[in-house]
Amino acid sequence: MGLKLLVAPGALVPRPETELLGTTAIETLRSMNVAAPLVIDMCCGTGNLACAIAVRLPEARIWACDLTQECVDVARGNVDNLGLGDRVAVSRGDLFGALSGQGLEKAVDAIVCNPPYISEKRLEGDRAHLLAREPREAFAAGPYGLSIHMKVLKEAPVFLRPGGVLLFEVGLGQDRQVAGLFERSAAYEAVSTVANGEGEGRVVLGHSRRS
């Protein structure tokens, strides 16, 4: 998204498809007309999404978190290098556990999440090459590649304000499955999918139900 970022062996290198998640999040936040949006970047990796949102939306405050110390260190380095330390905080923890005690419950305008989304079986098969340079934690997501999506979708309503939005990056062919997870939950409404230039659904989002 036009930013120069540090990367490291313990963090996923940002992919082009993640730019679609970032631009969709920024456009959605702008359309919500929130003066000073509060944003969570879940599974932040290098912090690329948190930094991009902070640069494009100067009034936003972002809480980024990841499970591994390697990712947290790289993300903090990128935040510091871009001079965003006053608006972007990076924490280590297991999903929303990293944000306990921050006072964010029912206050967050948007949660962006680029989670691992490759099944364990595929990582042992046709996607095994991904592990040559990047950590398993960046890719592995249970038997169907959706375990993190399911956990985040379940826990996000604790933090989203009514009308707030949860946005996921998804793997090829996962868009309908993730949209179905949203639609089967009573906590969400206005579910939609955003396709890339090839017509492939790579971002799925839903809004926290207002009533």
Language-model features: where?
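Conserved adenine-nucleotide phosphate-binding loops and their immediately adjacent elements
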Residues: M1-V7
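Conserved beta-strand segments of alpha/beta enzyme cores
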Residues: K4, R61, R87-A89, E189-S192
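Class I S-adenosylmethionine-dependent transferase superfamily signal
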Residues: A25, I53, L130, V152-A156
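Mobile active-site "lid"/loop adjacent to the S-adenosyl-L-methionine
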Residues: Y117-I148
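Proline-centered flexible-loop/turn and helix-kink motifs
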Residues: P58, L84, P135, A186-A187
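Conserved SAM/SAH cofactor-binding pocket of Class I
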Residues: V13, L20-G125
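C-terminal beta-strand of the catalytic ATP-binding
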Residues: Y117, H207-R210
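Conserved Class I SAM-dependent methyltransferase catalytic core
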Residues: P143-S208
